[in-house]
Amino acid sequence: NESEEWNGSTWTEGNNLNTGRGSACGFGTQTAAVMAGGHDQQTTTEKYDGTDWTNSGALGTGRRYLAGAGTQTAGVAFGGYAPPSPPAGFGLTEEFDGSSWTESGDLSTVRFALGGTGTQTAALAFGGATPPAVNSTEEYNGSSWTAGGNMVAVNKSNQGAGTQTAGLTFGGASTGTQTLGYDGTSWSIRPSLATGRSYFAGFGTDTAAIAAGNNPAATTVEEYTGDVETITAQTLTTS
C-alpha cells in the first residue's frame, strides 16, 4: 500500500494507501490523484491530496487490470476483468466526478491489461488482452467509444501517457521495450525503452513520460523526452 512521489530527479516516500492492492488504475496529478479497483475485484476508490489518501465513492463494478484517464474531479475507468478462469473481461466504462462513479458507454472490444490515457471527454484505450493480446485502439468522447488506428503490434500490460491526439504507449508483455506515438489517427514507432517491462506504472505527456518499476525491472525508472528515451535512470526506494 506504499506510495512514492517523483520530483523530476528522485523519489520520496509518501503516506500509504488505506487499502493495499495491485493491478488498480490511477489517474490525476501528484497533488490530486485517484486510485480505483485492483486485485480481489475491489471497488475501492481512494483520492490523494499530495499528503494523504482518503476513501471515496466505490466503483460500480469491482475489477482488476483496468485502465484510467482524466483528473480527480473528472475521471474515467474502463476495461478490466474478474475471475473465474479463463478471465471474464469487461468492456465497462465508468466516469468519476470526484465523489461517485456512473456507468457510461462500453468499450467496443472487451479487454483487460490495456493501456489508457487522455481525459474524461477525450480518452484513449489501446492494446490489452481478450484474453489474446490485441492491437486495437478506441477513442472516447465522453459517452461512447469509436475505433482508432491500430497499433503496429499486439500488446498487453502496456502503459500510456499524453492525450487522445498526442499519445504514447510503451512497454508491455508482448513488445517489451517498444514505444509508439499516436497523433489522433495512427501510431508510429518512437525510441525504445532501455529496459523492457510489463505491469508497471507510466505517466506524463508524449514528450515527457515516466516508466517506473515492475516486472522484471522492479525498481528501475526511465524518463522519456521525445528525442532520447532515457535521460536518467533512477531507482525506486524500498525503505
Annotate each predicted stretch with a short phrase:
Residues N1-S239:
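Polar, enzyme-active/binding microenvironments
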